[in-house]
Curated annotation (Swiss-Prot):
Keywords: Cell membrane, Iron, Membrane, Metal-binding, Monooxygenase, Oxidoreductase, Ubiquinone biosynthesis. Fe cation 1 binds at E64, E94, H97, E178. It comes from Pseudomonas putida (strain ATCC 700007 / DSM 6899 / JCM 31910 / BCRC 17059 / LMG 24140 / F1). One of its GO terms (cellular component) is plasma membrane. This is 3-demethoxyubiquinol 3-hydroxylase. Catalyzes the hydroxylation of 2-nonaprenyl-3-methyl-6-methoxy-1,4-benzoquinol during ubiquinone biosynthesis. Its cofactor is Fe cation. It is an enzyme of class 1 (oxidoreductase). Pathway: Cofactor biosynthesis; ubiquinone biosynthesis.
Amino acid sequence: MATERHYSPLDRLLLQADTAMRTLLPFSGQPARPSPAIVQPDVDLDEQQARHIAGLMRINHTGEVCAQALYQGQALTAKLPEVRKAMEHAAEEEVDHLAWCEQRIRQLNSHPSVLNPLFYGMSFGIGALAGLVSDKVSLGFVAATEHQVCKHLDEHLEQLPHEDEKSRAILEQMRIDEEQHAESALEAGGYRFPAPVRFGMSLLAKVMTKSTYRI
């Protein structure tokens, strides 16, 4: 039977640095799951439509950068091994979302947000602090964050042009995955944050969405 490898604190820091670089640099590999957009038809979009869709996908890409950082920060400070594993598994699934969003952004002749390093650092710190408080709070933060992401995805799905089936397929699959992450976190014992905390999180999310839509 294979034994589980135990990493030293230095090993974990180096792994975190590697993950940060792979998250923030242009994606060059292949996601574990192919993009849902692959099977959808190409359609002609006018310049205004393409620019708006690219802005929405840029927001979603930055949201996935934040989620990746949040999970990595929590995994670094999680107290229970099973919680750390859950965070790392969720982070792996977010890599697919990162790749899908970036691929779609490039197809629209645009680029990811230049603010991604800033939001990665902020989210990593928040995740690490949540993990230091308790695993229950850490898991609750995951659930609250993912529910906020689902809300944004619903709004973006309503804004997409009907003919853009590629972006729609990506966002619909992302929403399924994010909802599952939220429910899994609560089932694992995550704390249900009160309304004032969720409201504060929504204000922070608005700062991210407003700033990354264009840059």
